[in-house]
C-alpha cells in the first residue's frame, strides 16, 4: 500500500481519534492530542460526507465538551485548523474555541 504523506497524516489522525473515543467510552478524560484528534477526525469525515465548511466550523465546536477533557485542556486549544477534502476540492476549516 503506497500512501502519500497527506494520506498517512489522515490515517494517523483517524487512528488517534479511534483510540481517544475508546478511552472516552471507558470514562477517561481526554488530553490535548486526543481532543484535537477527535475534532480533526470529525472535520475530515464531515468533509468526506459532503458537509459545508461553515457547517463543520460550527459543528466542530460541539464534538466534545469541557467535562470530557482533563483540567486546563479547553484553555490550551484556541483554534483547530484542518485541511479537508470536499467534493469540490481541498479547503482549510478553522474551528475557533472548539471546546466550550
UniProtKB/Swiss-Prot annotation:
GO cellular component assignments:
cytoplasm
- Give the E.C. number(s): 3.5.1.5
Which residue windows are coiled coil? Answer: none
Q: Which domain of life is it from?
A: Bacteria
Report keywords, A-Z: Cytoplasm, Hydrolase
Pathway(s) the chain acts in: Nitrogen metabolism; urea degradation; CO(2) and NH(3) from urea (urease route): step 1/1
Q: Cite the GO molecular-function annotations of the record.
A: nickel cation binding; urease activity
What is the protein's quaternary organization? Heterotrimer of UreA (gamma), UreB (beta) and UreC (alpha) subunits. Three heterotrimers associate to form the active enzyme.
Protein name listed in UniProt: Urease subunit gamma
Q: Which organism is it from?
A: Rhodopseudomonas palustris (strain BisB18)
Amino acid at each position: 500500500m503506497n500512501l502519500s504523506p497527506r494520506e498517512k497524516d489522515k490515517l494517523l489522525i483517524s487512528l488517534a481519534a479511534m483510540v481517544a473515543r475508546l478511552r472516552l467510552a471507558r470514562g477517561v478524560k481526554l488530553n490535548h492530542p486526543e481532543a484535537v484528534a477527535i475534532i480533526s477526525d470529525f472535520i475530515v469525515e464531515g468533509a468526506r460526507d459532503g458537509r459545508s465548511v461553515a457547517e463543520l466550523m460550527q459543528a466542530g465546536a460541539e464534538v466534545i465538551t469541557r467535562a470530557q477533557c482533563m483540567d486546563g485542556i479547553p484553555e490550551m486549544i484556541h483554534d483547530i485548523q484542518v485541511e479537508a477534502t470536499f467534493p469540490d476540492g481541498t479547503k482549510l476549516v478553522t474551528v475557533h474555541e472548539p471546546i466550550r
